[in-house]
Amino acid sequence: MQPTADQFTEKGWAAIVLAQQLAQQRKHQQLETEHLLLSLLQQNALAGRILEKAGVSIGNLQTAVEAHLQEQPTMQAAPDSVYLGKGVNDLLDQAEKHKQAFGDSFISIEHLLLALAGDNRCGRKLLNQAGVDAGKLKVAIDAVRGNQKVTDQNPEGTYESLEKYGRDLSAAAREGKLDPVIGRDDEIRRTIQILSRRTKNNPVLIGEPGVGKTAIVEGLAQRIVNGDVPAALQNRQLITLDMGALIAGAKYRGEFEERLKAVLKEVTASEGQIVLFIDEIHTVVGAGATGGAMDASNLLKPMLARGELRCIGATTLDEHRQHIEKDPALERRFQQVLVDQPTVQDTISILRGLKERYEVHHGVRIADNALVAAAVLSSRYIADRFLPDKAIDLMDESAARLKMEITSKPEEIDEIDRKIVQLEMEKLSLGRESDSVSKERLEKLERELAELAEQQSALNAQWQQEKGAIDDLSSLKEEIERVQLQVEQAKRSYDLNKAAELEYGTLAGLQKQLSEKETALAQDGEAGDKSLLREEVTEDDIADVIAKWTGIPVAKLVQSEMEKLLGLEAELHQRVIGQEQAVQAVADAIQRSRAGLSDPNRPIASFLFLGPTGVGKTELSKALASQLFDSEAALVRIDMSEYMEKHSVSRLIGAPPGYVGYEAGGQLTEAVRRRPYAVILFDEVEKAHQDVFNVMLQILDDGRVTDGQGRTVDFTNTVLILTSNIGSQSILDLGGDDSQYREMERRVHDALHAHFRPEFLNRLDETIIFHSLRREELRQIVALQVNRLRERLCDRKLGLEISDTAADWLANAGYDPVYGARPLKRAIQRELETPIAKSILAGLYGDSQIVHVDVDVDQERLSFR
């Protein structure tokens, strides 16, 4: 027959074209069967799969074909075209007959292979030498093709569909590749119950991301392998479908549907032996539906309803609502299994079950208190994720961090290495000097270097020894895990002799070795010097990782931090002059929180600062942020004068769905989601619209609020400070006189109750009245402001000395009880900073000069020299 492209599949025709090219490259006049065989071996993955299934070594067969081609006569130059040899013509006729026998529409790779197995020229001989005949080849082809027919020019995509587009969870469970599943018995039992139904036997696991939906299916796979399931599920194969692989590369319309149909056909043909698992099942809705093609869900529906296909789905609550509930016909074919977040206690049990796997992987030990800390701390401080996923991640990252420390050079050795390099450089420099002082220093250096080298050698030996001991433990744990898997496999295959031999012989011996090594390592740690390496993850490691993730300091207080917290009040007083009550209240709240005594379901503290302008309300907030986070940038400042309209509430928590800006989120909620540990300042709160306070009620009482997108934002690690000028006139009129303090306080509270609702005021921890500033306090503020100016002048290499009389003069010039410290700031700018700036620009001050400031009594202004 004269071959044409429309008689062959795409891959079949490509094999013939490549065979022609191979004949030309080798300067052969005729295209023969050996060229076609080499073409199939070189290019075609399907031919290779079939031959490997038949037990052929592809490399050896290719070498044999190459050797046969070397023996063929060649031309002096490559021919322009090659002719079909008689052998190829006969082979193509045979391939046509095989096509008809299979009931196919096109000649494909498998027909060409079968024809080669009957080729009298060389194909049969070469294949027989490789250990395969037509019979074996037919069996291998049936195994690869299954029940598929060649009905188009690209049928290879439908062969071995499950192998290509799925992952066998049962095989993974048999090989011990799946993590153990702890608990979740109710959900697994309900899943088995639904799978055992006659029709609509399709459970869908619905739950928040990270609660363990996929783990439930893995647990089911382990139960099937262990035979711990009803008869309806005994010896079933659980395969997870990879929707990404199914869609990837499906270029032409209808190609995706063909692949999916092939998968479903294989599942149906298994007559219930295969259970399909589709993770993220919402992706089947609309998948592949381009250019008017049917989507995957419409292909699944008929089979799901008839019970021909057992399918387990998994998706989140939101995705289920958005995609699957919109298609009631698909939704009714699945039976819902709701998967709730486990409790902290259940999470601890899950972590204990997984602990061994993570210990073996990282080569470290994980203390039980670390597991408890991972569950408890993640539940408390990581609000936007779910247990057990966030607790497992914590444990994993803490173990990875410790492993990194073990494999890195210890700090003690690194310091000595750096010191040796530094001294070696100094030694080289001194070696060039000939004076007696340099020689003496050189001798001293050499002695120091010798001591350091000795220390380095001892520490390196200790490090290698400790590292070796930890590596030995890790290897033993890996070996124990491997033997445990062999024991399980032997028990499953009822090889009880082997199981007993491994369990009571090999495994018992390994566990004894492990126990001895762990005891020896612990004793060395207690008896010997300080260890360079730690090999156990503790609760402190977990706390450090949480702090890195969220910025919330949850680690145990070290001595330096305790001292810092005890001195917090004094530190705040250095920046905020006067206002004893306010500073003490703020410091007390922070100390309660860091000691772990504050209510975990409310913000750390919430204050309302009242007082006239310029007395330090905002400054105290900045000072607190600076003390807690070493930066004023950690202060989330919200100017409430921007929230005077009713609709501006949406700016705080985010616009509702359907409004412009819905995706952007709220200014307050987004700031706290990114930085959960913060000082939040609501400045001039009386200017906000009353509806803004409705949002704040929830924050003040429960420490949480729901943003425009329905996410819960946690405020339990924030300090809320609200400032207001309400009642400031009463404070100014009566605040200076101690005898009238009670009257002033009463008037301020009356003004407060007139403006704010009782339920808002009742939720605040404390309402603090800031007094108007006295002259002596202004004098201290002058000293503060002058120190700040001195620091700025230091950058220009200038000093500043100001006399007491000049400081008093500035305090008087800036004194205004109505406006607080702000007029003082303006007076310092006008009388002190501006003249100094002009003198610098005029070149009157050089480097390292000191600017002396005094008072010119005659002209009533400051003098500079």
UniProtKB/Swiss-Prot annotation:
Please provide the record's keywords in A-Z order.
ATP-binding, Chaperone, Coiled coil, Cytoplasm, Nucleotide-binding, Repeat, Stress response
Q: Which GO terms describe its cellular component?
A: cytoplasm
Domains: what does the record tell us? The Clp repeat (R) domain probably functions as a substrate-discriminating domain, recruiting aggregated proteins to the ClpB hexamer and/or stabilizing bound proteins. The NBD2 domain is responsible for oligomerization, whereas the NBD1 domain stabilizes the hexamer probably in an ATP-dependent manner. The movement of the coiled-coil domain is essential for ClpB ability to rescue proteins from an aggregated state, probably by pulling apart large aggregated proteins, which are bound between the coiled-coils motifs of adjacent ClpB subunits in the functional hexamer.
Annotated stretches, region: NBD2: 561-772
Tell me what this protein is called: Chaperone protein ClpB
> What species is this protein from?
Prochlorococcus marinus (strain MIT 9313)
- Compartment(s) of residence: Cytoplasm
Binding positions (ATP 2): G611, P612, T613, G614, V615, G616, K617, T618
